[in-house]
């Protein structure tokens, strides 16, 4: 697990073994930037922190920066953890499959013609299937499952020009329900990410790139007691564009992002009434 590996490095700590968040140089986990090729991933964890969001077999490497004080770094006061995709165009079909006691994952690399390739990966947990009969609390049935999917397409138009399309989707579902009635609590959360990057290499030390992206995180808590139901959904969505030029040690770039934030939307209902209270916010960053 990439997030678990970082916790073994100097200057990086975690609160407990059941926390996939990292605390770099004493900063809170929420102060770090976690992303894929410069695109942020919010709340990057599964199973309340036991698993991280990233399927390691889908990526080529991981970059870690403990001191993000460069102008090109994201606007965070903590560190940076960034997953990097494969640079090369795959020329043959290969992949891997891993089966564990809690989850399994698989990855497939395949060429699409001479100048294009695709990478697919998926991961899923099967706690309910194997351990469902043991997951009970005071007569209530406890259920949990997660899955995530990665997609990457690369194509070389010319010798030094490449198009990279990347997508990620992850989903978690947990619930605790009474066995003899419909009372219970449900919690769902997940991420979605899509990005497109066009990069041209002038030489080994000079390149220019343009990227557009969308990333979002959603969370929804629901509970029901007799004839009363309540839910607390929240979400954050970001749309951005970034462009950069690199020449040896010189980097010049521009980035803009639009954030849509919905902290909470309380909703209560009974058999006869329903109430909605909505809070929304927008933020622009450049």
PLM regions and their residue ranges:
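Outer-membrane beta-barrel proteins
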Residues: 90-95, 102, 130-152, 181-191, ...
């Amino acid at each position: 697990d990439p997030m678990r590996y970082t916790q073994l490095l100097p200057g990086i700590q975690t609160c407990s073994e059941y926390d996939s968040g990292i605390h770099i140089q004493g900063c809170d986990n929420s102060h770090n930037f976690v992303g894929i090729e410069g695109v942020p991933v919010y709340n990057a964890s599964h199973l309340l922190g036991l698993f991280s969001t990233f399927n390691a077999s889908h990526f080529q490497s991981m970059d870690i920066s403990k001191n993000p004080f460069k102008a090109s770094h994201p606007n965070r006061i903590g560190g940076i953890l960034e997953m990097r995709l494969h640079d090369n165009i795959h020329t043959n079909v290969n992949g891997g499959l891993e089966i564990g006691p809690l989850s399994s994952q698989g990855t497939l690399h395949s060429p699409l013609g001479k100048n294009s390739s695709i990478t697919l990966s998926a991961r899923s947990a099967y706690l309910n299937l194997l351990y469902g009969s043991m997951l009970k609390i005071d007569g209530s049935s406890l259920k949990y499952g997660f899955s995530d999917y990665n997609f990457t397409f690369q194509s070389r138009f010319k010798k030094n020009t490449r198009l990279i399309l990347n997508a990620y989707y992850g989903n978690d579902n947990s619930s605790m329900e009474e066995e003899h009635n419909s009372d219970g609590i449900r919690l769902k959360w997940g991420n979605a990410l899509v990005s497109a990057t066009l990069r041209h290499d002038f030489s080994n030390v000079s390149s220019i790139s343009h990227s557009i992206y969308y990333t979002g995180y959603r969370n929804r808590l629901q509970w029901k007691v007799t004839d009363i139901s309540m839910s607390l959904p929240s979400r954050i969505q970001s749309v951005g564009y970034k462009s950069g030029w690199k020449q040896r040690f010189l980097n010049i770039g521009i980035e803009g992002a639009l954030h849509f934030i919905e902290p909470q939307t309380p909703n209560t209902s009974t058999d006869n009434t329903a109430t909605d209270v909505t809070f929304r916010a927008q933020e622009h960053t450049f």
